[in-house]
From Swiss-Prot:
Family designation: Belongs to the IlvD/Edd family.
Modified residues (N6-carboxylysine): K124
Keywords from the named record: 2Fe-2S, Amino-acid biosynthesis, Branched-chain amino acid biosynthesis, Iron, Iron-sulfur, Lyase, Magnesium, Metal-binding
Entry protein name: Dihydroxy-acid dehydratase
InterPro entries registered for this protein in UniProt: Dihydro-acid_dehy_C (IPR042096), DihydroxyA_deHydtase (IPR004404), DiOHA_6PGluconate_deHydtase_CS (IPR020558), ILV_EDD_C (IPR056740), ILV_EDD_N (IPR000581), IlvD/EDD_N (IPR037237)
Species of the source: Salmonella schwarzengrund (strain CVM19633)
Cofactor or coenzyme needed: [2Fe-2S] cluster; Mg(2+)
Keyword RNA-binding found: no
Function in brief: Functions in the biosynthesis of branched-chain amino acids. Catalyzes the dehydration of (2R,3R)-2,3-dihydroxy-3-methylpentanoate (2,3-dihydroxy-3-methylvalerate) into 2-oxo-3-methylpentanoate (2-oxo-3-methylvalerate) and of (2R)-2,3-dihydroxy-3-methylbutanoate (2,3-dihydroxyisovalerate) into 2-oxo-3-methylbutanoate (2-oxoisovalerate), the penultimate precursor to L-isoleucine and L-valine, respectively.
Active site (UniProt): S517
Catalytic function, reaction form: (2R)-2,3-dihydroxy-3-methylbutanoate = 3-methyl-2-oxobutanoate + H2O; (2R,3R)-2,3-dihydroxy-3-methylpentanoate = (S)-3-methyl-2-oxopentanoate + H2O
GO cellular component, one term: cytosol
Cofactor note as given: Binds 1 [2Fe-2S] cluster per subunit. This cluster acts as a Lewis acid cofactor.
Top-rank lineage group of the source organism: Bacteria
Length: 616
């Protein structure tokens, strides 16, 4: 029988000092012996996806204490990728994932907590907490802040839905008037919550639900809706049950590594491909799998991407649907239900409620459930009122969207495309693979060949795009922006948005060893591995080289013979200690970022730290 970890600090005469300090936090004699459960919050006023979380930790803590546990809350950092985008701040986004994971480990292990409730929401916070949870392998439940309502405004006598990306594109489009740009900016992000499309934050919260580590509805129920409060109340109660099951009944099925098994990871990736999720999810799932000691690789993702269709299309791939529409159509379990009927899921998995996948679908798939309370929950909709308050409205759709032929979520028979929303490409400068969000690529450019325009920083590429130096047919290559080379693997949302604003969204390709925001669409290929700074062939591409992209055949090729590539590699090596570094880039890199870069691996490994350099 496992011993409560917290007993290390609460039992025995030699722990009198620790107990004295626990008493100073409000604990009494009756608390010593109860499970101590960490409430891992991420409230900050910097991030709309987290601005409403301040009181939600207290909500969870009250339920933990009412259920027989002791709750202790702490906070992690949280970076807003949208605000950090397009300047030096983006260098810090991906490294913050590792800091978050480490800080959770530090706090939980330093104080011997027995279990956790993770209150996350946005881009690097959910992955960081997920990595920590699988590293620690103690009972955990995730409950996120929820998606933002879609922005809405009237343009050309028509009400349209908006998000952050629309504001960025219109702000850079010289053909858009100042008045219209201002109108879109003010309408794009109306409430608290994670940005309203299938961007990285919402993608990861959906995948956490598919992994079984959060409750049904967690990935799609709006941040502003009163129904979301119940998820927090349930999490506080349920975590005590899971904790006691493990420590008092020796039930290892309560542990996250047994819930988020390899089968669950495959299901999560299958969901991601079917819903056209952010390419960042690939990076984060690979990293989380390593923490769980699961053999889940780019090869597994490639195999899944070749057989899973696209069953859901959401912004930024279409303006028609946002997360509020996904929820109305049944949310994550609506998509999983269709995938299950298509025979594409592993059914032998369980979630934090202890339900198998078939049991969960029977109760929560809107196309089969008889539970009226579940149907009511999935009718939770937007109010259209600007607010930063959680649970501030209780509006509902008049009906569910259960139209699997023409609705937001489709059945296999009526799939948006036979090929899924993500694909892995391989070639002579992406030997270990690269990722493209096919859900956002127009059919006319699934095959694309053109001359390279090479830039060694995102800033130079943006200047060239806005300066008219990139023209129709070009393949923009942005390198030395990988985990090690950036450092920090910047997102390239501004270059892709500016290509659209210049009328080149369907006329150019963009390739990088960096990554893309979940808000990116178009022929945008990222995560090229190995990256330039690690000796990747992408570092050898020159202006004018021909690059051929063939998404249907999963191929990307630099059209040079092997002898020429070898000669360029030899010339690069001859640069000595300057080899595999940008030639003319002026970038101040802090000591903290240099420390991150010294251990960073390429994207095909999840951009995690190279344990071999630490003797592990």
């Amino acid at each position: 029988m496992p011993k409560y970890r917290s007993a290390t600090t609460t039992h025995g005469r030699n722990m009198a000092g620790a107990r004295a300090l626990w008493r100073a936090t409000g604990m009494t004699d009756s608390d010593f012996g109860k499970p101590i459960i960490a409430v891992v919050n991420s409230f900050t006023q910097f991030v709309p996806g987290h601005v409403h979380l301040r009181d939600l930790g207290k909500l969870v803590a009250e339920q933990i204490e009412a259920s027989g546990g002791v709750a202790k809350e702490f906070n992690t950092i949280a970076v807003d990728d949208g605000i950090a985008m397009g300047h030096g701040g983006m260098l810090y986004s991906l490294p913050s994932r590792e800091l978050i994971a480490d800080s959770v480990e530090y706090m939980v292990n330093a104080h011997c907590a027995d279990a956790m409730v993770c209150i996350s929401n946005c881009d690097k916070i959910t992955p960081g907490m997920l990595m920590a949870s699988l590293r620690l392998n103690i009972p955990v439940i995730f409950v996120s802040g929820g998606p933002m309502e879609a922005g809405k405004t009237k343009l050309s006598d028509q009400i349209i839905k908006l998000d952050l990306v629309d504001a960025m594109i219109q702000g850079a489009d010289p053909k858009v008037s100042d008045d219209q740009s201002n109108q879109v900016e003010r309408s794009a992000c109306p409430t608290c919550g994670s940005c309203s499309g299938m961007f990285t934050a919402n993608s990861m919260n959906c995948l956490t639900e598919a992994l079984g580590l959060s409750q049904p509805g967690n990935g799609s129920l709006l941040a502003t809706h009163a129904d979301r409060k119940q998820l927090f109340l349930n999490a506080g109660k349920r975590i005590v049950e899971l904790t006691k099951r493990y420590y008092e009944q020796d039930d290892e099925s309560a542990l996250p590594r047994n819930i988020a098994s390899k089968a669950a990871f495959e299901n999560a990736m299958t969901l991601d491909i079917a819903m056209g999720g952010s390419t960042n999810t690939v990076l984060h799932l690979l990293a989380a799998a390593q923490e769980a000691e699961i053999d889940f690789t780019m090869s597994d993702i490639d195999k899944l991407s070749r057989k899973v269709p696209q069953l859901c299309k959401v912004a930024p791939s279409t303006q028609k649907y946002h997360m509020e529409d996904v929820h109305r159509a049944g949310g994550v379990l609506g998509i999983l239900g269709e995938l299950d009927r298509a025979g594409l899921l592993n059914r032998n998995v369980k979630n934090v409620l202890g339900l198998t996948l078939p049991q969960t679908l029977e109760q929560y798939d809107i196309t089969v459930t008889q539970d009226e309370a579940v149907k009511k929950m999935f009718r939770a909709g937007p109010a259209g009122i600007r607010t930063t308050q959680a649970f501030s409205q209780d509006c509902r759709w008049d009906s569910l969207d259960d139209d699997r032929a023409a609705g937001c979520i489709r059945s296999l028979e009526y799939a948006y495309s036979k090929d899924g929303g993500l694909a892995v490409l391989y070639g002579n400068f992406a030997e270990n693979g690269c990722i493209v969000k096919t859900a956002g690529v127009d059919d006319s450019i699934l095959k694309f060949t053109g001359p390279a325009k090479v830039y060694e920083s995102q800033d130079d590429a943006v200047e060239a795009i806005l300066g008219g130096k990139v023209v129709e047919g070009d393949v923009v290559v942005i390198r030395y922006e990988g985990p090690k080379g950036g450092p920090g693997m910047q997102e390239m949302l501004y270059p892709t948005s500016f290509l659209k604003s210049m009328g080149l969204g369907k006329a150019c390709a963009l390739i990088t060893d960096g990554r893309f925001s979940g808000g990116t669409s178009g022929l945008s290929i990222g995560h090229v591995s190995p990256e330039a700074a690690s000796g990747g062939t992408i570092a050898l591409i020159e202006d004018g080289d021909t690059i051929a992209i063939d998404i249907p055949n999963r191929s990307i090729q630099l059209q040079l013979n092997e002898a020429e590539i070898a000669a360029r590699r030899e010339a690069q090596e001859a640069r000595g200690d300057k080899a595999w570094t940008p030639k003319n880039r002026q970038r101040q890199v802090s000591f903290a970022l240099r420390a991150y870069a010294s251990l960073a691996t390429s994207a095909d490994k999840g951009a995690v730290r190279d344990k071999s350099k630490l003797g592990g």
